[in-house]
Every structure is written in structure tokens, then in C-alpha cells.
Amino acid sequence: MFYPWSFSRVCTGELCVLRDDLGLLTDLDAQLLAISVDSKYVQRVFAEREGFTFPLLADFWPHGEVARRYGIFDGVAGVALRGTFIVDREGVLRWSIVRGIPDARDAQQYRDVLATLD
């Protein structure tokens, strides 16, 4: 899942909900990867401070390149939009949602979609 900024209110809230429900995601055989344009050093401190045990990836340099490839880089703000992509074991995109920078996603949607995939 892409998120705009580490340590921001909405991003931290979204990731903390997923942290607290991580057991449910792993029970559904899902792996969570979270990515923003923050540096790996920021990501490390953010993960330690919030107790995240899932990987936080840094799309730092070239700046936003991964987000650009997914078509969700906001060139004006210089960050990724809130994009979530569920990819199956074969690398096939099964579901996605993209929200604006200020708009939090509903984690229940992830649970519902993952429960329907084989």
C-alpha cells in the first residue's frame, strides 16, 4: 500500500489499524508492504516508534519512481496518493483502490477482498 508521508496523522492512523489487524491479514495469507517517498532512515524510525513489524519501503530515489509506475504519484505534492494494490501469488493485480492525499482508506475493504480470493 502506498501512503503519502510517514508520521502524518492520516497515514499513521491507517498503518496503525493494519498493525493492530496484522494477524487477520496473515491468517488470510496476505503480506503487507507499505511504501512512501520518505527515506529509509525515516521509515526505520517510523516503524520503531509505531511498532510496525511489516516492511516499510522507501520510494525515495529516484524520487517516487515506484509510485509513478503504478500511476499514483502526485507531482505537485511530490508524494504518492493513497493507493492499495492486492496482487496474487502469480503477480496478477486482483484489486486496487486509489484515494486522494487527505482521504483515509477503510481497512475493512481489504479484509473483505482478501476473504474472497483463493
Question: Locations of the language-model features?
Answer:
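Chalcogenol-based redox active-site neighborhoods
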Residues: 1-118
